[in-house]
């Protein structure tokens, strides 16, 4: 409940910031992931969704715990972070949340349903 309220508050707080400018399409993301090894690929879906399939090199931090766990799991606030979910709604909310938390090099990859490249299953 509290996490939901925080997400709604953050969404409203950053509604004026054009998060669409932070979008990256799958082909550009793939090119960069293949050449830049320091990019963090962040999956904000549930653990169940992650186990079913995810993009290789992904780090799972579900949206409902992102505000609480970001500082520990994503200590470098200047690192390039590509955020994705299933359809793009949670990734957009996650980008807004991370902006509020001080992260500055964010890209909204959108949904894995638009990812035409290899995915893997399992926990890691």
Regions found by a protein language model. Give the residues of each.
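Short, surface-exposed ligand- or partner-binding patches at beta-edge/loop junctions that are enriched
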Residues: 84
């Amino acid at each position: 409940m509290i996490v939901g309220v925080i997400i709604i508050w953050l969404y409203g707080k950053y509604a004026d910031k054009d998060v669409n400018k932070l979008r990256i399409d799958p082909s550009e993301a793939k090119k960069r992931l293949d050449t830049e090894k320091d990019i963090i690929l962040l999956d904000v879906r549930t653990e169940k969704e992650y186990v079913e399939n995810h993009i290789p090199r992904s780090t799972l931090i579900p949206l409902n715990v992102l505000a609480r766990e970001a500082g520990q799991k994503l200590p470098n606030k200047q690192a390039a972070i590509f955020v994705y979910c299933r359809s793009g709604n949670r990734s957009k909310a996650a980008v807004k949340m991370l902006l509020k938390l001080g992260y500055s090099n964010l890209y909204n990859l959108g949904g894995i349903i638009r990812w035409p490249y290899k995915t893997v299953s399992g926990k890691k």
